[in-house]
């Protein structure tokens, strides 16, 4: 009975630690993704010349200006 109690407690502790580690990894992944999106916005902004003054997309090297960053626009296929 005592051994069963020890094994149960050990199992519960290890499963809790696994969930906690998974949550930590997920949180780090989400923060990394946010940092990457911000970095991509900065790179697009700097490389394409998108600025606060002109948000109509004329100054982008491709695509359109959105949130002060240049983004590619998908071309629509023309129907024949």
UniProtKB/Swiss-Prot annotation:
This is Turripeptide VI/VII-01. One of its GO terms (molecular function) is toxin activity. Expressed by the venom duct. Disulfide bonds join 48-61, 50-65, 60-70. It comes from Gemmula speciosa (Splendid gem-turris). The presence of a 'disulfide through disulfide knot' structurally defines this protein as a knottin. The cysteine framework is VI/VII (C-C-CC-C-C). Keywords: Cleavage on pair of basic residues, Disulfide bond, Knottin, Neurotoxin, Secreted, Signal, Toxin. The keyword Ribosomal protein does not apply. It is found in: Secreted. Residues 23-36, 77-80 form a propeptide. The keyword Methyltransferase does not apply.
């Amino acid at each position: 009975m005592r051994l069963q109690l020890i094994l149960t407690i050990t199992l519960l502790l290890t499963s809790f630690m696994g969930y906690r580690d998974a949550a930590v990894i997920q949180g780090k992944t989400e923060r990394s993704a946010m940092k990457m999106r911000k970095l991509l916005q900065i790179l697009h902004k700097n490389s394409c010349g998108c600025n606060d003054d002109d948000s109509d997309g004329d100054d982008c090297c491709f695509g359109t200006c959105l949130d002060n960053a240049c983004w590619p626009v998908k071309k629509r296929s023309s129907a024949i």
